[in-house]
Amino acid sequence: LPYINNNYDFAEMASEMLGELNVSHTGCRFGGTGSTLATASLGVFFDDTYEGDGLKIKEIMKGSPLETSKKEIEPGYIIKAIDGQEIKAGQDYYPLLDGKAGRYTRLTISKKGKEFDITIKPISQGTENGLLYKRWIERNRQIVDKLSNNRIAYVHIKAMDAASFQTLYKELMSDENRNKEAVI
């Protein structure tokens, strides 16, 4: 192995070795040595058509910091500033969230022209990915319920592991799904 001198090459070699086992769902990858400063997330979707200063909220994900804040925040409100730094029209706001996951952060919100501040703890990108996954599942479930007149259940298995199988079984056997005619 004299030519394996970095983590990427080692991961490639390990993946090839694992491939020789002829089993599924195996592999090795290298995570990289990028910046340790992670950009936090607010767990919201913004209105891309809004052209004014700030960020106009289009949708707030269930379980996000804005959904669980003490002040009721709704779609249509505008985030004018993050920790006192104003957000101008078209400005890249991500640098304002660098390193803020899990740290108290002040947002200035505008509701019909009236401004107020709230303090939240932004979430990591990984946590937001979990919220996006749950949102995707719920949207799929709603589509299946609507198109089947609630006759077909929708479940999704997140991964090939014991916890995911337990969740799948729990959902299949729930009062909501147990007596449905079919499962997707």
Regions found by a protein language model. Give the residues of each.
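Conserved catalytic motifs of ABC-family nucleotide-binding domains
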Residues: G76
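Cleft-lining beta-strand/loop regions that shape enzyme active-site pockets
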Residues: L1-P2, G31-S35, K56-E59, G63-P65, ...
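PDZ/PDZ-like peptide-tail recognition elements
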Residues: E16, E20-G63, E67, Q142-K146
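Amphipathic alpha-helical substructures
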Residues: L1-H25
